[in-house]
């Protein structure tokens, strides 16, 4: 802020995904800086566009740099999305830790579980659309499909049911099996995006 007692939303407010990037950077113990990775690419690309616009033309080399920076920025933003999905797996894990003998520890235990799961699934669904994503590769598409399938359309609840379907075994068994799928999904996303394992566990 420039200290003028007002906020310029064009330059003094961090919106939407930039906040998630900053949270993941702050939560990293290995120096991950997704915010800088994205911002540097935006700034360089915009600088070249500004210069070429003023000049009235853009060279092939400049165009190639702009395209490269666009890909870098897009992939950095997607890393923020993936890291945030990973973060919500960890939040869901913490929520499940509070469930004992098929009972929530409190009303907030239930609301937090469902809120965190909804965030998780929403962010994970967002990994489908970037054409330069790791998951856009032919040999990776099935992995993302499996991750989304394993997350399901609702979390497993304290009674072991999921999306209105009762557990076939005990509630504890259903929750344990579901948690194993979520952790496997979390770890797979970590590998796909090249995140350090310690960050994946701690985000």
Question: Residue ranges of each PLM-predicted region?
Answer:
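Mature extracytoplasmic or organellar-lumen-exposed domains after removal of signal/transit peptides
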Residues: 1-203
């Amino acid at each position: 802020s420039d200290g003028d007692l007002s906020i310029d939303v064009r330059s003094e407010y961090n919106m939407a995904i930039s906040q998630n990037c900053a949270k993941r950077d702050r939560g990293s113990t290995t120096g991950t800086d997704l915010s800088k990775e994205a911002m540097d690419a935006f700034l360089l690309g915009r600088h070249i566009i500004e210069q070429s616009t003023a000049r009235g033309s853009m060279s092939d080399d400049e165009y190639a740099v702009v395209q490269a920076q666009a890909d870098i920025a897009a992939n950095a933003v997607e890393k923020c999305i993936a890291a945030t999905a990973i973060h919500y797996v960890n939040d869901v894990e913490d929520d499940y830790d509070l469930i004992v003998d098929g009972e929530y520890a409190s009303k907030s235990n239930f609301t937090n579980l469902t809120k965190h799961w909804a965030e998780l699934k929403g962010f994970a669904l967002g990994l489908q659309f970037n054409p330069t994503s790791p998951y856009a590769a032919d040999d990776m598409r099935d992995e993302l499909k499996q991750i989304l399938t394993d997350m399901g359309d609702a979390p497993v609840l304290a009674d072991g049911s999921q999306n209105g379907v009762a557990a076939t075994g005990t509630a504890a068994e259903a929750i344990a099996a579901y948690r194993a799928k979520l952790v496997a999904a979390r770890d797979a996303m970590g590998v796909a995006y090249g995140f350090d394992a310690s960050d994946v566990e701690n985000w």
